[in-house]
Amino acid sequence: AYVGNTPTDTDHQKDVDIVHAPRSTGSVLKPFLYAAMLHEGELLPTQLVPDVPTQIGGYSPQNFSNSFEGAVSADMALAKSLNIPFVWLLKQFTTYRFYDVLQHLQLKNINRHPDHYGLSIILGGAESNLWDLAQAYTNLASETEVFARTQHYRTKEFQHLRYTDTAPLDFGKNTRELPTLRAGAL
């Protein structure tokens, strides 16, 4: 449920809708990169990725802990939200391909050329709003639930979140064709 902006006076900022305001994505895009790479067969959950001091073209990502774990499995890097392994993974996948994934997920505030964001996009170097992020994760969860129950995908699985239930959703036709990004990878 979307609850907010209750009727108050301007002193309480009823006119600020933070749900739709673009904010730094922080680490919330990491699962999308992980899923995209699994989907493309470019990563395995137990594959070791480097968590070591790194400098790529003058960019030196750091982990929140300011420490390094050496070689770490991809699933553990995701679970611990380690920054350096995900910069390495994004470098391998490329910002261009990742940008295309984010566009498929309909993160509309991420709308500049991939070169604008560079590798920092995976660590919060882009902005998105809570509404679009919730929509992306909700659609992926729906895809997983439907496939687990029916063993098929739907051609129009990705839907826009709605404020009201005025009309039924059209999920399109059933298909066995793989989607652009399978949520089951998560």
Regions found by a protein language model. Name each.
Residues L43-F98, S142, L161-L186:
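Conserved catalytic neighborhood of penicillin-recognizing serine enzymes
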Residues V16, P22-V49, A77, A136-A141:
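Active-site SXXK
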Residues A21-G26, E69-G70, A74, L78, ...:
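Secondary-structure capping and boundary motifs in well-ordered enzyme cores
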Residues T6-T10, S24, T54-I56, N83-P85, ...:
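Solvent-exposed loop/turn segments at secondary-structure junctions
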Residues S60-N63, T94-Q135:
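Mid-domain, small-residue-enriched loop/turn segments at the edges of structured enzyme/sensor domains
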Residues T46, I110-I121, F147-R154:
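Surface-exposed patches in mature extracellular/periplasmic domains of secreted proteins
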Residues A1-V19, L29, N129-L186:
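A penicillin-recognizing enzyme superfamily signal
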